Amino acid sequence: MEIVCEDFQKVLTKIKLLRENANIIEETVQRSVREIVQNVRESRDEALFFYTKKFDGVEIKDVRVSEEEIKQASMFVESSFLEALQEAKKNIISYHEKQKRQSMFDCTSKGIIRGQIIRPLENIGVYVPGGTASYPSSVLMNVLPAKLAGVKKIVMVTPPRAGGIDPHILVAASLAGVDEIYMIGGAQAIAALAYGTESIPKVDKIVGPGNLYVALAKREVYGIVNIDMIAGPSEIVVIADETGNAKYIAADLLSQAEHDERATAICITTNIELAKEVEKEIERQLETLPRSEIARESINRNGAIFIVPSIDEALQLSNEIAPEHLELHIKEPMNALAYVKHAGSIFLGPYAPEPLGDYLAGPNHVLPTSGTARFFSPLSVDDFVKKSSFLSYTEEALRDVKHHIVELANKEGLHAHAKAIQIRFGEEE
């Protein structure tokens, strides 16, 4: 891992280049994704079966997972796994319950009523990855907020493997309350949820992380359906001062690097000695990681340790990066929280490692990446509701303000708007 001692702007330039390189890859893949989406839109199930055989190496005739298969899945998982899943579910629910909001209205003495109705989406599709790793935790993180919001129908898609779907995924789906599960993955699954096929129902919104093909397919169908966000490769930034523990920091950086060769792992520190220790620890820990090949490629391609003169500058740099995950391994991390403007999720102190948020603590692990934490937020109950405004005026209330409406409408050249007000008071011309 490279240790960089350069000024602020040079560091930002390096990070910008990393993201631009990722965009070049995206442009190449986008053409392929567009073709897949169009074929599924036109050929429906036929295209689904074709792409499943082509990309997953599995020949299927029926994409729906049966109720019997879901029930039997519990026979193939460990009791310790089920206990961990139950604990995670409890924490996710307790955290997200506090996000629920109520419809509201206000009224005045003249009989003006204004308000907002909050309603759950009717149906959603959840994408659960199933490539180089299986993610039961993603099932809980995507489904439970939707259940709390009151979504009526939740459909899940996940790539098939030889022999079916990982039983841990099926158990998590059953525990979370998924209504229907389909063995389909990749861009073709996103297209099926967006347009519907003979087997898979069209949904109103698609959520859940996936690989580059999945992310670009979500971008392609946005507007036909709603989506949560365009999620890129995983990212972590660790800010550390001289109190940082090199073993902890290295382990946390590698926890993200092992996701994907395109993942980004950055340490920003004020202490050169700590930087050297972190570098050594990364090499040492890589030797024992089962996914060391992926993690090493990620570290070599997108990893760096930046030396800065102060924690203030470290925070400033982090705000420019706007990382998915930010860890603060510094004295009094809570005091620094107010200065963090842009980050998907923030982890304070040495005993709040990023995997705690990935699995168990309760806050959602579906987070904005690639700098989009500047304007996107973690997945929440709000993502599964929609809002409608309503208003009611009495004749007297409208009469009091009609001249303002007419003035504004005429200024915009929308005279029928003005007339719609005037006609109610015999002022037609």
From Swiss-Prot:
Keyword Disulfide bond: no
Alphabetized Gene3D superfamilies for the sequence: 1.20.5.1300, Nitrogenase molybdenum iron protein domain (3.40.50.1980)
Residues at the catalytic site: 324-325
Alphabetized UniProt keyword annotations: Amino-acid biosynthesis, Histidine biosynthesis, Metal-binding, NAD, Oxidoreductase, Zinc
Pfam family, one: Histidinol_dh
EC numbers for this chain: 1.1.1.23
Biological process (GO), any one: L-histidine biosynthetic process
Enzyme class (EC, first level): oxidoreductase
Pathway field: Amino-acid biosynthesis; L-histidine biosynthesis; L-histidine from 5-phospho-alpha-D-ribose 1-diphosphate: step 9/9
Family (UniProt): Belongs to the histidinol dehydrogenase family.
Role: Catalyzes the sequential NAD-dependent oxidations of L-histidinol to L-histidinaldehyde and then to L-histidine.
Protein name in UniProt: Histidinol dehydrogenase
Species name: Bacillus thuringiensis subsp. konkukian (strain 97-27)
